[in-house]
């Protein structure tokens, strides 16, 4: 057979291009980058879940007083918005 003789002759010559193993480091870099991105997405959705579902439970009723307790505002009167004064006006209007 002619094909078998040609194949044997080419095998005897050896490879025409020397074998170069594929670089392992860049591929492992991209695998690591993928897992880092997965972790970032996991923690982003976890924080979103905590803020939207758990954090709303712990919001105080009086935000001005909460800011005073934290030391952000010096006194409750320095708040930007006072809802109690508007309720007093509406109560007087209804009576």
Curated annotation (Swiss-Prot):
Q: Its induction, per UniProt?
A: By dexamethasone.
Which top-level group of life is the source organism from? Eukaryota
A Pfam family (short name) is Dexa_ind
Found in which tissues? Highest levels in heart. Also expressed in brain, liver, pancreas, placenta and lung. Up-regulated in emphysematous lung compared to normal lung.
The record ties this protein, via PANTHER family, to: DEXAMETHASONE-INDUCED PROTEIN (PTHR17070:SF0)
Similarity-based family: Belongs to the DEXI family.
- The identity of this protein, by name, is Dexamethasone-induced protein
* Source organism of the structure: Homo sapiens (Human)
